[in-house]
Amino acid sequence: FYDTTCPK
């Protein structure tokens, strides 16, 4: 899962 709270 990719954390969308991070810019990258």
From Swiss-Prot:
Cofactor info, note text: Binds 2 calcium ions per subunit.
EC numbers on record: 1.11.1.7
Entry annotated with the keyword Flavoprotein: no
Localization (cell): Secreted
Gene Ontology CC annotation, any one: extracellular region
Reactions catalysed: 2 a phenolic donor + H2O2 = 2 a phenolic radical donor + 2 H2O
Claim: Chaperone is one of the keywords in the record: no
Main location: secreted
Function field: Removal of H(2)O(2), oxidation of toxic reductants, biosynthesis and degradation of lignin, suberization, auxin catabolism, response to environmental stresses such as wounding, pathogen attack and oxidative stress. These functions might be dependent on each isozyme/isoform in each plant tissue.
Similarity-based family: Belongs to the peroxidase family. Classical plant (class III) peroxidase subfamily.
Protein name, per record: Peroxidase 4
